[in-house]
Amino acid sequence: MQRMFMLFCFVNMLAAFACYTFVTQELGLIFALVNVLVMAETVFTYPKVGLSEMLYLAFINIYCTWLPLHMIALRLLDNGAWMLMSVFIMVWICDSGAYFSGRAFGRHKMAPHLSPKKTIEGAVGGVLLTIVSAVVIEQFLPLATSMLHTCLIGLLVAFGAIVGDLFESYLKRSFGVKDSGKILPGHGGFADRFDSFLLVAPLCFYYFSIMQG
């Protein structure tokens, strides 16, 4: 069953590259084939594969594939490369701002059972600095049609980054691991560096899509 999970994730991540290279039709076909094969596996191995395993598989599909795909989808929008880079910058500023604000002013724990070092004051500092960074970026690269929309983009990025970081901490606590892997030596796994982007990407993609009509 574990090998099936790993194969499922691997093929779906290949679908992400198909999305970037071949746009939408081939991606849809790959997803359809993979999911039909997984359903066939559950049918012919029942009751070996139960509902809990299928729900786990669905979560993997969402968290490891559907959410990251929005980074590529964001890149494919008009001025997508600049938008994606701007989002990355804002997320990094949010993370750094929350860290240093928490170190300087942190008093009240935000989620003590998940991440004892994160504070409400740190989160507020991260949000404010992200909004400021969105306004600064707007001077060089138009992100929105008004200052209000620019501030909303900064707020969305900060909200998604903070929740994404906490959710990855929740996953690590649930699975009893310190880091999500050793892909990046000294920095933990892939998710330890990019957890904040996973929820920000879909928020920004749909927001920018609505603004572009």
Located regions from the model:
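Acidic (Asp/Glu-rich) catalytic motifs at the cytosolic membrane interface
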Residues: 91-107, 111, 120, 159-201
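A short, terminal or domain-edge coil/loop segment
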Residues: 57-65, 141, 166-171, 201-205
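Juxtamembrane boundary at the C-terminal end of a transmembrane helix
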Residues: 206-213
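Membrane-embedded alpha-helical bundles of polytopic integral membrane proteins
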Residues: 1-155
